[in-house]
A protein has these predicted regions:
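Active-site neighborhoods of metal-dependent hydrolases
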Residues: 85, 100, 152-156, 162-167
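Conserved beta-strand position repeated once per blade in WD40 beta-propeller domains
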Residues: 88, 206, 246-247
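Extracytoplasmic/lumenal domain signature
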Residues: 1-19, 63, 69-72, 109-152, ...
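Substrate-gating cap/lid region and adjacent catalytic-acid/histidine neighborhood
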Residues: 92, 96-98, 106, 116-119
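Residue-level marker for isolated small/hydroxyl-bearing positions within beta-strands
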Residues: 101-103, 161-162, 218, 258-259
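Extended catalytic-interface subdomain
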Residues: 1-83, 87-92, 96, 100-101
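Short consensus segments that form the blades of beta-propeller domains
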Residues: 77-80, 156-162, 196-198
């Protein structure tokens, strides 16, 4: 158990709402992803879309973790599609190591007064990019509807956050230190050539660990199942697709099998 400290967080909620002055932060482990989108550190394949991302990051409320939703629009980073997400972590109890896959993705949210909520999204959005990559949520019975982005995207549909967009991290639960952190996946099956060079792709499913010290994870948008040494980063690839958390099936025989979406049963040695 590591100490928790209260830190000041951004203030200024919309009318009718409130935020607390402080939030609890653990002293360890260190954050798995970045928590602030620096306008000087945005990403783009071209100067045009990078410039768009920079200006948008400057125009929105963008004060890091716990930036309140606002009428002018706020950056959420990590977002509902970022950080340690749907797949969840895995724990190697014999080695006291936690393995977590994460997404380094931001999103935006705009609070719209109820009087304007009958308008179309294209009329409420700041531009066509926000309209393409957002949804209008009505939030019936509240003073606001919201324009919630699926991701903070450039005009080319590329995340404004710098790669890696996906990572895998091992944490020593005794010390709270990161043992290793590596980009997870590539853009090979996500983007056209020549943009396969990006390391660290969006990912969904979580990792699975074995008692023998192996970590297996599919999860990524490229078609590989990856195997790692849990204690220190050594990897290998199996060419197959799977976006869900890999299952480990141990029948009465001595064999063990990996199973999951897109996977045949793969025999492994524990």
């Amino acid at each position: 158990i590591f100490p928790i400290e209260e830190r000041d967080v951004p203030q200024g909620a919309v009318e009718g709402d409130y935020v607390t002055k402080t939030q609890p932060f653990p002293s360890k482990p260190a954050p798995l992803t970045k928590t602030y989108l620096d306008p000087e550190d945005v990403f783009g394949f071209t100067p045009w879309d990078k410039g768009y991302c920079k200006k948008a990051a400057e125009d929105y409320r963008n004060e890091g973790l716990y930036t309140p939703p606002s009428i002018e629009g706020s950056v959420h980073y990590p977002s509902a599609i970022g950080g340690a997400n749907w797949g969840g972590p895995a724990i190697d109890a014999s080695r006291n190591i936690l393995i977590a896959n994460t997404m380094n993705l931001a999103s935006t949210i705009v609070m719209v007064p109820r009087s304007d909520c009958d308008k179309a999204l294209k009329d409420l959005a700041r531009d066509s990019v926000q309209s393409r990559f957002s949804a209008l949520q009505q939030n019936e019975g509240t003073p606001y509807c919201t324009i919630r982005a699926f991701g903070f995207m450039s005009p080319l549909g590329v995340p404004c956050t710098k790669p890696p967009w996906g990572s895998l991290t091992a944490i020593d639960l005794d010390t709270g230190d990161h043992l290793w952190q590596i980009p997870l996946g590539t853009s090979k099956d996500l983007a056209p050539f020549p943009f396969w060079w990006i390391k660290g792709a969006p990912n969904i499913g979580g990792p699975t660990v074995t008692a023998s010290g192996l970590t297996f994870i599919a999860a990524t948008s490229d078609y590989y199942l990856r195997a790692f040494n849990t204690s220190f980063f050594v990897s290998s690839l199996i060419s197959t697709k799977g976006n869900l958390t890999v299952g480990l099936h141990i029948p009465k025989s001595d064999a063990a099998y990996l199973t999951g979406e897109g996977l045949l049963a793969i025999n492994i040695a524990l």
